[in-house]
Amino acid sequence: MKKYEYPELGEVLYKERLENGLTVAVVPRPGFSKKLAYFVTDYGSIHTDFTLDGREIHAPAGIAHFLEHKMFDLPGGRDVSAELAALGAGTNAFTSYDMTAYYISCTENFEESLRLLIEFVSTPYFTEESVQKEMGIIDQEIGMNEDAPDSRVFENLVSSLYREHLIRVPILGTSRTIREITPQMLRDCHRAFYTPGNMILCVVGDVDPDRVAEIAAEMLGSEARSVGRKLRPWQEPMDSSGEDPTMAMEVAMPTFQLGFKCEPSQTGADAIRQEVIGDLAAEALFGESSELYLKLYEEGLIDSSFGGGFETVDGMAMLLCSGDSYDAGTIREAILSQAAKIVREGLDEADFLRMKRSALGRRIRDLDSFDSTCFRICAYHFSDFDYFRFPSVYQEVQSGEIQEFLGRVVQQNRCALSIVNPIQEESEHVY
């Protein structure tokens, strides 16, 4: 494996693209007993439309998450979680809008656990009976999600902000769409995207990098298989629908999310530059040390629940903030006004440099987390960027770029405000 050194971070990364197309990345952590492995595919809930073997396939919403659930089934009734537990390893998985990850964590029997991780993720086994059974389980999960105010306020926000992009559809799908899923559909999605050339295996821990690559090659073979081609039919305008959705739920006080549409996510070095600019813009506009945050807090418009940041998903990006408040509309007006002030007057250069150093320090400290390191290496790999190069991006970003971003993005026509009110107050107040 090729060795890459990052003296500024004190990090080393071993990386290799196997003959079968799989990328293997290993971050050594000498002396640590914990070992973590992520096996990730560049495929998430928004990738429902794709081509395979010359056919256009339009899969039901929620199929990526459904497939994640079913990958833990192996022929012969084998229980993957029980087998890993017997080896002393824990396992889990998650589906996001644009990727699906399976991971194991252990302090012993790492090689056996790694083999089992690769085996179950690479073995499609779907029966009519098991698929029908899973529908009931996921339908319950959908019901729980629909009863969660934090989920509903976000889903209502993106449904108002986005007209075409599939972030407007819940990752879990709906009770109706999951009932359209068949074993053959799951096999098609697995064959299209669970191929070595569309995946990355990332390991953090006190392990032999070459041995990790050898195991992956042994388990997956040398044949490079074709990858499904994602269809991205999103022609997304930059303006929002102009609607501010509200609903009533069992909450103690109104909760809100405010979002501003940004230009679609980038790739390569532009991807992390876009994220850094967006994060710094959020910090300058309404971060805890910002002028606006202190003003809103002193006026009682926000409390410790308030926060925000910059989010990207394949094909979209947005600046957002959220919290509990009885007057979210006033908060929106204050944010629009403060953004205009920053654009007009600029940022204090000393304050900007302190903010940039603080943000860089947080990202460096984040590398202490095995999970965060694995996740970010995988996510940025799919954006064609070497994540450990992020310090240079912070050094390059200038305060004028933050002004330009805020002037372009924080506009009335690009925003939507989603509010969940307490049931008893829905008929009494308009927010």
Language-model features: where?
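His/Glu-rich zincin catalytic helix
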Residues: 1-79, 187-295, 415-431
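Histidine-acidic residue clusters that define the catalytic metal-binding segment
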Residues: 2-15, 160-199, 233-234, 363, ...
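M16 family metallopeptidases and their MPP-like homologs
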Residues: 27, 32-50, 79-120, 154-176, ...
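Short, polar/flexible loop-turn hinges at active-site or ligand-entry regions and domain interfaces
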Residues: 122-129
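Short, low-order "capping/linker" segments at domain edges
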Residues: 143-147, 241-253, 360-371
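Mid-domain, small-residue-enriched loop/turn segments at the edges of structured enzyme/sensor domains
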Residues: 149-153
